[in-house]
Every structure is written in C-alpha cells, then in structure tokens.
Amino acid sequence: MLQVHQFPCLTDNYGFLLHDPASGETAAIDTPDGAEYLRQAQAKGWRITQIWNTHWHPDHAGGNAAIVAATGARVTGPEEVTRIAPLDRVVAHGDVVTLGDWRAAVIDVSGHTNGHVAYHLPEAGIAFVGDSVFALGCGRMFEGTPRQFWDSLSRIKTLPPETVLYCAHEYTAANARFARHADPDNAELAAYAREIDAKRTAGEATVPTRLSRELATNPFLRADDATLQARWGGGDAVATFAALRAAKDAF
C-alpha cells in the first residue's frame, strides 16, 4: 500500500513524500525545501528516487537541485518547470507516470500557471493538486484566464468524489472566511468552517481534504451552482468563477 508522508515546510507549504514499500521507490511531490525533504526522507528510512513537480514556482521546484545532487532522483514535470530547473521527463495532460507498479494520471489544471498539472493515482484514491485547488479555495490566477482555470477545476470535479486531495498550502482558515462571505447560507460550509477553526486552534493540519466535501462547500468548485451564480452577478460558471476569484484577491 502506498504511504504518504506530509510535513510542513517554508512558511505555509506542505511537503509530500509518496512511498511504495513494494519497490522501495519514493517520489517527492514538489520541492519547496530540498534540505527538509532530505531530512524527512532520512528520518523515514526512505530514498527519494523521483521528483514530480506540479508547476514552476520556486516554492514548488526550488528544491529540485539539492535533492537531485544528493540522491540522483529523476525529475518529472510540466515543461514550464525548465524555467528554473532541468527535467528528465516533460509531461502533459493524459500522460502517465509510475512509482513501482502504481500509475498516476497527469491532469491539466492550468490557471494558477499556464502549465500547472496534477497527479491522480486512481487506484490509491489520491491526487496531488499543487496550487490548483485548496481546501475551500483555489490558487491565484497568475498566468491563466478564468475560462482556462474553470475548465481545470471542472476536470478535478470529475474525479471520484471520495478522492483525497493533497493541496500544497495551509490556507484553509483564510479560505474559510472568504467562503463564508461568498456563500453565507451554506450550512455544510458553516460546519466545515467551525471544524477548521478548531483544528487550527489545536495546531492541526487541514490538509488533505476530500473532493466530496469540497464539491459541497468550496465556492470556486461551485461556480456552476445556480444559487451562487445569482449571488455573484447572474452569469455563467466562468463569469461567476471570475467574480469570485477577483473578490478573493481583494478580500
């Protein structure tokens, strides 16, 4: 069975090590802090053999060089990562990467950046989504368009609802405040927000999250909901997503 080791790094990033006991392989999912990844792997008794980058930002690929120098790990990611680090394999939507006998489908989730990808392991029921979607939020739209980003979120929405989403940042408390503003009559969201407050007060992580919960509470994944559309200008899903994203940027 695959093992996921999650740990905090930098200011608000999460690091992830994905380990396959059968093959002994370990993938670093993004590399916010190469030294911390190496420390975490050593503490687990694992050797990092692969790196899977989701996008090019330094808090996701900036640790590649340190890990490769220490381990010789093979680096996989979208072409845009070559802006700051070399890749052994360039991947895009529809490609498959493997860890031992486990297969991960590469999904185009562009919008935060133009080449952003996610890695979905259907047999394990997990997906590493980088900065495309967060618990109760989504990434800032630095490079993409509202249509592009909504199409990406729509692809995530089609995954099995029980899929566990590993998001790259602990932004959930702030996201919950905006979500309650955006969708104040959502009772399930209100309950989720109370749970988040309790977890953060106790110093607990709110990541990972489950897609089924996000489909019911995350306003950015619900831009196709008629009630939310009426509240945010009466437009279609793309227009509603754009309005929500602009409002969150200014919130």
Residue ranges with predicted function:
Residues 137-163:
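Active-site-adjacent loop/tail segments of enzyme domains
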